[in-house]
Amino acid sequence: MIFVMLLRCDFRKLGKLGPRMICIFMGCAITLGIGFFALFPLFANALGGADKTWGATAALYASWAGGSANMAAMEDALPVDSGAYSCALALDTACYSLWIALLLFAVKYAQKWNKACKADTSKLDAVAAAANEEVAKETNVKPNAADWIFLIGLTLVVSAISQYIGVQMNGFFKGVGLSFFDKGTCTTVFVTILGLICAMTPLGKLPAVTEFSSVYLYAVVSLIASTATLIDLLSAPMWVVYGLGIRLVHVVLMFILSKVFHWDLCMDSTASVACIGGSASAPIIATAYDGSFAGIGVLMGVLGAAIGNFLGLGMGALLKLFV
């Protein structure tokens, strides 16, 4: 799934966003990460204990930095408790719905935000035009049965190779004393890098990639969630409080960054939703400001998918310090 998901993450296309939009997105991802890390020791016991929840929390951060596909990928890369993962999924769903509603409500206050931050929107239209042109190239091609069959075969081959390489990498890292890099982590890192490289080849232009990765995602998330019992969800309320605390830290820090770098609310909101919801959700917020901004939202979501696995693994290494 990871490999297919990343085939659409061509960094050459992401260049259409320009450095300013990429910085806004990274600002969102980093401020969310600060919230996760700073609040985790305060909530760890209420969530079920640091030793039981650090993996699921890192997986949730991967989702909030790039989308649900990254969260599913972390299930193989990190030791994720099924009960904690179920609670994290509940939090992901609750915060996603609430966050979309709040950011849509905030549209009418954009002028006040922009005035307070002295926002610079002079180049926004040019970036939007370039992003929309790039997105239009992909939507004009329709997949056929041959594309689906080829992708199924390709993913099976890549899976076999990745499992073998993961074992070899794990043996190497054990030899140099890096215990964090177990077989699952090594496999995830390898297949992520392979996917990003292949995205810049003709494989990245296959028309069935988006649909195929979505099918994989729904299947994997459903299977993972089905392993948890309903009793595990009783701790979900504290997960929701933890998530709201993270969002509060995120908003405060983003406002400070916007004041310093003169970022506008439209792109702040689009980047924030691109982090938590991916390329399917970001255009909703972007087009609430201007219909021509949809392409920016899509490309921001693609950027999140590309880096979400690495950010999730990094957060896992940090949260494990509290165990």
Per-region residue spans from a language model:
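Hydrophobic transmembrane alpha-helices of secondary-active transporters
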Residues: M1-R20, V189-G204, T210-S235
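Alpha-helical transmembrane segments of multi-pass small-molecule/ion transporters
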Residues: G18-I197, I231-V240, L244-C275, S279-V323
